[in-house]
Amino acid sequence: MVIVYFVPLPTKSQHITFTRMNRKRILALIAALITIGVTKAQDTVDIWNLPPLSIEQGRYTTDWDNLSRQYNTPAWWREAKLGAWSHWDPQSAAEDGDWYSRGMYMEGHPQSKFHREHFGHPSEYGYKELCRDWKTDLWDPEDLMQLYQKMGARYFLALGNHHDNFDCWNSKYQPWNSVNIGPHQDIVGIWEKVARKYGMPFGIGFHSTPARTWGQFMPVRYTSDKQGDKAGVPYDAMLTKADGYKPNADGTDKWWKGMDPQDLYGPIHHDGRKSLESPFANQFMWRVDDAIRKYQPDMIYFDDHAGDSQVDLGIDMGLGKLTPQIIAHFYNIADKRTEGRKEVVATFKGVGGRYNSFQRNPEMVGIVDRSLVKSTELYTEDDIMAFPFQTEVSLQEWHYQKGGSYRSAEEIITRLMQNVSRNGCLLLNVTQHGRGNIDDEARQICLDFGRWIDINQEAVYSARPFDVWGNNDVIYTRQGGHIYAVILHPSSNPIVLPALSSQSAS
């Protein structure tokens, strides 16, 4: 909508000479009014009826064969070996573990019981209230980035969104975001600036994929208790924008007046199996594009499968047909931005292995593997891989769990070296409290881990697999004509390295 101001003509006594400067001012005013109108229109965009995203054109196309021929995993990422991850969002505020925004709505679930005891019934205090009350006052991104570097990390990933559907940036296509709601901060934007300041390649993680969010998280919220005093009372996910204009019992306005809960919880649907055909799939593409263009990441991560043949919790998983579109779009944008000087990384799950999402067309696995970096959450490949991969692990729970235990520095070292020896990298989430800080125990583990890497860095950074990766006692890597043997369980006994015998060494 463009607003036009009509200026009355001057009387003879108020005669105005329309000089060139006057005309410039008038044109500037018109341009400003048009800009205001466009901005207003963008602010009120219907995120459930967006046109298809136009894929950025360039040397990469949406054809898998083209992608596999054109793409090379960048040297900066292959040499880095270790990345730090901030897997942190409003769900962290509850401090009751991962997938909280789903479990809190499932009557009988431990997280549902916790939520009612600590916050209230989800008809009165739903996930939108947890987002509203998310505070980040103890978050010190500069301190954490320095810790990540002391830990030995050489790239950093921020959580853009999780399955909860809340965006942690100044999102153009999701009004339920960290600038409008909760901390009123551009979390991703702040992380991006700090990472660049400390010379860390920057990435964004997208977990709000159609299968996870539309298929698994949204439908469980459209219900009510089956038992107890609140039986039959709808949870807050059933509310609409119109409900926000109804005053509270005491006559006050609802805090979310003007916002639409269905933008967070989704339009009510009870069958999320075919999520790629939903209006959410198109919205998801626009949100990814928005973050890519705003923050120019060196890496993007997707917590979902590249193919579409896996089923989880009764839902067809994977980005399927969207995967090559996302990859080509991201690669071409980065290619133009850097004039081809710097390659970027796109990470997806389910490319071969135990969770292969190309079961209907297994011949695609090798082609897809060459087109991106495959992700293996919590699972290290069994042998040396032909193409680089990434394993993601968390120091504690993915979202902070009060009373949860930590992995030791020794376990993280083992995980890292298992990956390096098999042609992979490790991405480590240093679990944050809801308010953004970390425990002293977590800090100490990071420092201990970092000291080990500093001493043994030749066996880590830029290293490549040896002829064999090793065994449960010793792990091998190589670099610059040298072979490194990492002893996992040092003892006073003689060390035997069978892989280096004259019969087996090359």
Features from the language model and the residues they span:
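Mature catalytic domains of secreted/periplasmic carbohydrate-active enzymes
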Residues: 42-506
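Hydrophobic h-region of N-terminal signal peptides that target proteins for export
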Residues: 32-39
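Intrinsic disorder/low-complexity segments enriched in polar/small residues
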Residues: 13-15, 25, 41-43
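Bacterial N-terminal signal peptides that target proteins for export
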Residues: 19-27
